[in-house]
Amino acid sequence: FLFSKVPALLRFEKFADRMGLYRVSALHPDKEVCILIHGINSSPNTWHEALNKTFADKEVRERYEFWSFGYPSGASIPYLAANLRDSLHEMLAFRQQKGATQQRITLIGHSMGGLLAKAMTQESGDKDWSKIFNVPIEQLEVRSGNREILRNMIYYQSFPEVKRVVFCAVPHRGSQIAANPGRRLVSDVVQMPQQLAQLTSEIVKQSSYALTPLGLEIAKKGSNSIDQLRPASP
């Protein structure tokens, strides 16, 4: 897994092309899928020791096909969750082509990875959109590609294939660590994904009238995973 913890936290674009699901055990279409999702300032390598111990268990080894989701962990959580959803759709289609007889998924998330896992069991729509924008998405003056990025981040369905989620030290109510002064300094140098930077700039320049006060605050300040892990984060 070609992720380096700190650089992947700070420099999204350098690692963006490596984001996605990686199969870490042999393909077995008749098995259930278990997906491991690492946390902030981490990488798929964090699961190495756990996987070695897991593979030693014959019952678990025979039941599950293992995958891991790798991602640059400094980007905003909704953006990363949208990418995980896309990766899950691609994985399900791939396994179906290979003759998968079932598509039951277990997600295991550590730290922020647990928040991404939880997002796969949730639904979102107009109620969440209206917290940020005061016009419908189709009336927003942005390019069609940027509109789809927004749609994927805010309008989504849960995955019926996800039958179980295991949380490992997950900050469901935020983390005080993300609010300390040192982390705030780190947050200031986290690189925003280029797609999001362009989208935010376009909204501020052409559609600022469409933003709610909360939306305007987010658009002007920007938001990354460290900001969103603060207990006071909206």
State what each model feature region is.
Residues 34-40, 69-221:
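Serine-dependent carboxylesterase/thioesterase catalytic core
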Residues 7-20, 25, 200-234:
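Alpha/beta-hydrolase fold catalytic core
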Residues 48-64:
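Short amphipathic alpha-helix adjacent to the substrate-entry channel of hydrolases
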Residues 1-36, 43-49, 65-69, 90-100:
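Flexible, membrane-associating and regulatory peripheral segments of lipid-active enzymes
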Residues 53-57, 152-154, 227-230:
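Intrinsically disordered, low-complexity boundary segments flanking structured domains
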Residues 26, 98-99, 155-158, 229-234:
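A general structural signal for short secondary-structure junctions and capping/turn motifs
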Residues 47, 51, 81-84:
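Amphipathic alpha-helical segments in well-structured domains
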